Amino acid sequence: IANSWNGVLISLTAHASGTTLASQLLGETAAHEMGHQLGLFHTTESGGTVFDILTDTAECLNSTKDFDRNGKMSAEECEGYGAQNVMFWRPWTPASRSAGKKQETLSSHQQQVLKYSPIAK
């Protein structure tokens, strides 16, 4: 619903190291935040016990994937279980990003949500 309070803010300083901007991460963050604006939820929430309602998005279960037992699901722990999705709750670590890991995928149902979002019309 359009009004004067809708929008997305993204910190450039959170996506920079010195004078270098992490453009891939910035693009993924922008896509993620716009996904929220258009009606998408995190595929897996931080604790690995709450998931979106879409039946074709992967779930990363805390009970089987929280290898470091810190109660938070990292992209590394959830590789192959939704971490590659634009709407995963946490980005890859810098080391994984350097190895080519990205969050660029959307499921068919997520694409449908975006297609039919009233804001996107």
Q: What name fits each language-model region?
A:
Residues S98-K121:
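A recurrent domain-boundary module in secreted/ectodomain proteins
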Residues T20-L106:
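The catalytic-center signature of Zn2+-dependent metalloproteases
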Residues G7, E28-A31, Q111:
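Extracytoplasmic/secreted envelope proteins and their assembly/folding machinery
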Residues I10, M87-F88, L114:
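Bulky hydrophobic/aromatic "packing anchor" residues in well-ordered structure
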Residues I1-A22:
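Active-site scaffold of zinc-dependent metalloenzymes
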